[in-house]
Regions:
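Short, contiguous alpha-helical
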Residues: 2-41, 46-91, 126-159
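Acidic/histidine-rich alpha-helical segments that form the ligand environment
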Residues: 93-127, 134-139, 143
Length: 159
C-alpha cells in the first residue's frame, strides 16, 4: 500500500459507520438522536406517507421507494461492472397513495435494499475506480438528501 492509498478495511468500516448513521443507528456524526431514516419512517403512517407536500411534490412513499431503487441500482451496477440507463422517473410518476400493507412492504423493501448495500461494501475487495468508489459513497449522500426531504415534509404533514 502506498502512502496515498486508503486500505479497503478502513473504507469498509467508514462506509458501515456512515450507512448505519444514515439508516439505523445515530452516533452523532451528522444526525441528531432518533433521526435516522428507519427511526423517522417508524413515525409515519400510510396516510402520511401518501400525502404530497405540494402540488407537484412526491409523496413520502415515493421518496422511500426511490431510495430503495437507487440502492438496488447501485448494487446491481457495481456488481455487474456495467452502468446502464434506468428510468429514474417511474417511481415519481406512479407512486401516490399507499395502504398500510403497501407502506409496510415499501419500508421492508428499503430494509432489504440497505442490507444488500452493506453486503456489497463487505463483498467488494477493492474499489477499482472513481465510479465504483463514488457510487458507494453516493449511497450515503443520496440517502441523507432524501432523509432531509422527508424530515422537512414531516414539518408540514405533522402540523
Amino acid at each position: 500500500m502506498t502512502p496515498n492509498t486508503i486500505a479497503v478495511e478502513h473504507f469498509t468500516k467508514a462506509m458501515h459507520l456512515l450507512l448505519d448513521e444514515t439508516f439505523s443507528s445515530v452516533r452523532g456524526i451528522f444526525l441528531d438522536k432518533n433521526t435516522s431514516l428507519f427511526e423517522t419512517l417508524d413515525t409515519i403512517s400510510a396516510e402520511e406517507a401518501s400525502f404530497p407536500v405540494g402540488g407537484r411534490c412526491a409523496t413520502l412513499a415515493a421518496q422511500v421507494k426511490h431510495i430503495a431503487f437507487y440502492l438496488d441500482t447501485v448494487d446491481a451496477q457495481v456488481r455487474a461492472g456495467k452502468y446502464e440507463p434506468v428510468d429514474w422517473g417511474e417511481i415519481w410518476r406512479t407512486t401516490r397513495e399507499v395502504s398500510p400493507a403497501e407502506w409496510e412492504t415499501i419500508k421492508a423493501n428499503l430494509r432489504d435494499s440497505y442490507a444488500r448495500i452493506k453486503k456489497l461494501v463487505d463483498d467488494t475487495p477493492a474499489w477499482p475506480d472513481e465510479g465504483t468508489l463514488g457510487g458507494a459513497m453516493a449511497t450515503v449522500v443520496h440517502t441523507a438528501y432524501h432523509l432531509g426531504e422527508i424530515r422537512q415534509a414531516l414539518c408540514v404533514i405533522k402540523k
